[in-house]
């Protein structure tokens, strides 16, 4: 009888273990999001396309669109529209007063809506040294950390290409953008020393800067809370003929324990939206 009871206990424990594993690993720990500005269609229609193809969130969403995304049963992966544009960021003290006012006003609203992340930018820098720009960013961002921590909202600074070139893709770069490499971004994270300040690693932009993407992820993943990606090199939708190994990228994110979103961010897709989204998500899901 005792042996039978023990056998039943073992079976029950095994059943619980299997179900726990299923709960944790049964779903992909990485969610795919669609960056709003990249797809030239109405927000509600983009939400429908996302759901049809296995995306779970919309990315870089302005305040007036937050409720639309929520009503469609999707998550706002990253809030946008609170900053003053990519060029006017925290490394320039001229914008501190307005930026601080904007973020202080919107962070409580983000918390009310259940939105966990909001983008911010270093801005362009033509006058300061890297260290001076770092100190300027610290001065501008530090007043926001307490309110962000209390609201459980993370400020996420995007890494962007500053490469100055006359090539066809010039519009997708930002000359003199300060936060153009993860070393500088990580230095800022360390100075701020807050769990509510992280980096947005844009794969297309960092590849454009000549970075070793896989090496960066291995070194700096603990400072990164969000990723953006587009077809490399043309910044279209993802394609199997691209020079970048998307499967290796996604597998590495899982290996380092990443459990956030990867935002699909091609450059202004106006035609063939459905097929672009479908093929891109298929590649990111390793199918």
Locations of the language-model features?
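Bacterial N-terminal signal peptides
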Residues: 10-20
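Histidine-acidic metal/acid-base catalytic patches
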Residues: 25-31, 36, 40-51, 114-117, ...
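Structural motif corresponding to the early beta-alpha repeats
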Residues: 28-41, 48, 52-139, 267-269
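Short, hinge-like loop/turn segments at secondary-structure boundaries
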Residues: 75-79, 95-96, 136-137, 174-178, ...
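Conserved radical SAM core fold
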Residues: 83-88, 125-127, 162-164, 230-236
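Active-site acidic/histidine proton-transfer and metal-coordination neighborhood
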Residues: 92-198, 208
